[in-house]
């Protein structure tokens, strides 16, 4: 058995994801696949368009063997923490052999070079980084500029190599890949990394063309504007389309950030700058800007646009407001990191091969496998606190269901993992 690990959101599972799955299995020669997938809230500070069990079901029906949930506290975090949470989870399972992620560059070597520098920064690199941060831009841009300057100074790279590294630092999936590699190094993990080029659609593309591949962003944008599934039929597997149609039909999808608009504005207007200061990723006096803008804006979009700046991107603002909604504080994140990251592996969906993987994990995993919360007792305070955030996230997410009968709390206790029986 050779187990391939994937880090995913599947929002929703589309043809590009299926291509990534098939190519990853081919280049790694893996026999089994496990995907760590975000739950009901995602890394860009948005809710998933359909709940986590249905997205896991889409993936298993399209060939992923096992889906494990990335705890909410990491799923909604910065690229660095998102990657750390996901890689730590795969590492702690004990028998994952390799990792394959999509990237714009399609070559793991330059990403490994960058990860090496960022993982063990010299005093000179830190000095150059401070210089660029003080110029006032966003941290990712400052870090990219500092890295290029530092590498030029070392004179260890030719012009072509520097150009390749420069290009790598401009693309979101490359940056996320670098964070995966940093986490593997930090954990001294035996998991072997691979990458493949993303096929066709750009990560941020908002258009669905005649191609069979479209970005998840384009699919969500289409559903938000057109409010029908017909236009996405060519870019998602049939199972994804059927599951989406069912969820839409019973009032459980699609879910968008605007569904939480009134809740968020209410929370902000009853908060104080002192309260906001405790929310994770709020720093440098940003709480005052958020507080002021919340009393001027009447929609979420107005709020995002009012708060964002050259230093604080819209995506970062979206994440911060999601942390507020879910009450994820700085103390929470520091506490979880101090206790080694994810404390359990929650099973969302699996097939017969997934069952074989779970059997393997029984003897290798350093964290408990959780299939039914009714039968799970957190083994320590970190697990208890982490699980409380996961449950809170689902309880709030279900408030966006248009069928009020389905919006009750404790869905985490009432929903079992999906099992795909190959004999059916």
Curated annotation (Swiss-Prot):
Predominant cellular place of this UniProt entry's protein: cytoplasm
Compartments reported by the entry: Cytoplasm
Keyword Metal-binding on entry: no
Chain residues that bind ATP: 7-20, 102, 173, 198
Domain of life: Bacteria
Gene Ontology cellular component terms for the protein in this record: cytoplasm
Enzyme Commission code: 6.3.4.-
Keywords assigned by UniProt, alphabetized: ATP-binding, Cytoplasm, Ligase, Nucleotide-binding, RNA-binding, tRNA processing, tRNA-binding
Molecular function as annotated in GO: ATP binding; ligase activity, forming carbon-nitrogen bonds; tRNA binding
InterPro entries: Rossmann-like_a/b/a_fold, tRNA(Met)_cyd_acetate_ligase
Family: Belongs to the TmcAL family.
NCBIfam families: PRK13670.1
Function (record text): Catalyzes the formation of N(4)-acetylcytidine (ac(4)C) at the wobble position of elongator tRNA(Met), using acetate and ATP as substrates. First activates an acetate ion to form acetyladenylate (Ac-AMP) and then transfers the acetyl group to tRNA to form ac(4)C34.
Name of the molecule in the record: tRNA(Met) cytidine acetate ligase
Organism name: Alkaliphilus oremlandii (strain OhILAs)
Top-level taxonomy: Bacteria, Bacillati, Bacillota, Clostridia, Peptostreptococcales
